[in-house]
Amino acid sequence: IPSIDQEHLSLVLGKHYVISFQDRIEGDVFDNLRKRVNNPKSRLRKFRSDYLFYALIDSVVDGYFVIMEFLKIRIDDLENYVLENPDQQVINQIIAIRKQLTMIRKVVMPLREAVDRLFSDESDFITEETYLFFRDVQDHISHLMGSFDGFRDSVGSLTDLYMSNLSNSLNVIMKTLTIFSLFFVPLTFIAGVYGMNFQHMPELGWKYGYPMVW
């Protein structure tokens, strides 16, 4: 399962500016946004700084939707693998996805709190029109949280299904071993009887005794 890269991001909104602080500036969720900024006809060049501030946060949220779609596909694939071939590799992937979901939730929660705080504090730098855009971002984050929680439940169900299939496989093996052991019970009994050191065993003098045992 591919790893999910993390990066620290800070945004500062002023009346006529937005300042961003991040670890790297290439290959991130803002690549498409940079192209829009460089386009003279782009809405980002015509609107105020608060709209750019919104666009940056919206790009981050959209990036999580890409991750969500990827994880959905992986969970669906793992469900088929668990049913067909519940081996150790499958449970390792289930554990890896569960860790990723936990990590993502820890990252999305502060973002949700930050967006909620924009509404409770009502910044003078954000217009009423831009607040409507932020309302959509708020809804998208809530949808993300619900989806990731649902995925976490699905991963828990996959773990239970894996353990159930593994238990069934062990039961089949035990039944097979039991059948083989029942087959050897008479042989073990005969070997035990004739392995005893009794002084008088009449059948030992029978000429067909040895062939009958074999």
Predicted features by range, described:
Residues 1-128, 133-136, 140-145, 150, ...:
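Peripheral, non-transmembrane regulatory/ligand-interaction domains of membrane transport proteins
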Residues 139-214:
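Hydrophobic alpha-helical transmembrane segments and their immediately adjacent juxtamembrane loops
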